[in-house]
């Protein structure tokens, strides 16, 4: 799709964009663009790479409409959501960190030691996890009951093992995790599902101001939404986040900390499942490496 094509589609929806656009080609499903309208406002564009993404776009649109009613932080305001183009005004501030997929360089856009980050993230998590399951049902979104969480992971482990392979050490750890009853919660809540510092926007002072990339949001084990934090900020910061989350009214159980560590350790499995789903060779190679499999 050319810049002129994008301008024409945007104009059909009443958005007049300049021809000066920049693009990030890394996405599998969407090409991401950055553009400016005639009033100087900056927009983020998502251009579908395939014709079969309409259902996925509608699902994420429903998620965004649901969460913006409940969160005090910004989420993308999709002003155009068509099978050909998604567009929304850029959020204020920047992600806590950005990651260059080519050079692997990490850039922090906030003070990593900010005392504001953990309390403000905890507040957003409490708001998110408090969304009523009835509202989730009404929006037709995925719901996993407590007794459905482990079987889904076990099925994915079997799929990844058969399609990509997995080293004995990781498989043993994951099966031990799945068999450890005391780690698993007896409740599930609405979660983001892919939350880490790259999807969390903050002020320079480290106050959380927005969250992006909501396509995986569903009802499941809340340790999902803590695991991305420990991978970036470490175990002591995870303990602080759980403490703050509980203090602000979040629902926890005795082994949330231990469960989160195991969830974080299962990142290669999650990546492997993503690679199998997308059948993208770059991700398949990357997943095999993380899973300890020789290419």
For each feature predicted by the language model, list its residue ranges.
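An alpha-helical support segment within catalytic cores of ATP-dependent transferases
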Residues: 1-17, 92, 107-114, 118-119, ...
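Active-site Asp-x-Gly
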Residues: 55, 188-190, 196-257
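ATP-binding pocket architecture of kinase catalytic cores
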Residues: 20-142
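Short acidic/polar mixed-charge low-complexity motifs
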Residues: 15, 39-43, 207
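Short secondary-structure junctions
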Residues: 10-18, 71-73, 253
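Short helix-adjacent coil turns
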Residues: 276-282
């Amino acid at each position: 799709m050319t810049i002129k094509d994008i301008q024409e589609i945007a104009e059909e929806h009443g958005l007049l964009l300049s021809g000066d656009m920049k693009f990030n080609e890394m996405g599998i499903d969407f090409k991401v663009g950055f553009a400016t309208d005639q009033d100087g406002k900056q927009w983020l564009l998502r251009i579908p790479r395939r014709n079969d993404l309409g259902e996925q776009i509608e699902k994420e649109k429903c998620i965004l409409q649901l969460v913006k009613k409940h969160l005090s932080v910004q989420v993308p305001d999709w002003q155009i959501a068509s099978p050909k183009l998604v567009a929304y005004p850029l959020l204020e501030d920047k992600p806590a960190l950005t990651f260059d997929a080519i050079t692997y360089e990490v850039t922090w856009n906030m003070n990593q030691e900010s005392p504001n980050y953990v309390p403000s993230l905890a507040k957003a998590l409490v708001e998110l996890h408090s969304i009523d399951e009835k509202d989730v049902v009404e929006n037709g979104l995925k719901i996993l009951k407590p007794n459905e969480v482990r079987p889904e992971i076990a099925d994915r482990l079997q799929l990844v093992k058969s399609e990509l392979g997995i080293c004995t050490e990781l498989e043993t750890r994951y099966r031990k995790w799945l068999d450890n009853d005391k780690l698993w919660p007896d409740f599930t809540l609405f979660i983001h599902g892919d939350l880490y510092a790259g999807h969390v926007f903050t002020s320079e002072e480290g106050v959380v101001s927005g969250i992006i990339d909501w396509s995986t949001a569903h009802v499941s084990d809340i340790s999902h939404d803590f695991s991305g934090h420990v991978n970036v900020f470490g175990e002591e910061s995870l303990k602080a986040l759980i403490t703050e989350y509980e203090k602000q009214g979040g629902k926890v159980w005795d082994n949330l900390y231990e469960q989160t560590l195991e969830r974080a350790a299962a990142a290669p499995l999650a990546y492997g499942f993503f690679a199998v789903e997308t059948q993208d060779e770059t991700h398949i190679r990357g997943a095999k490496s993380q899973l300890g499999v020789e290419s």
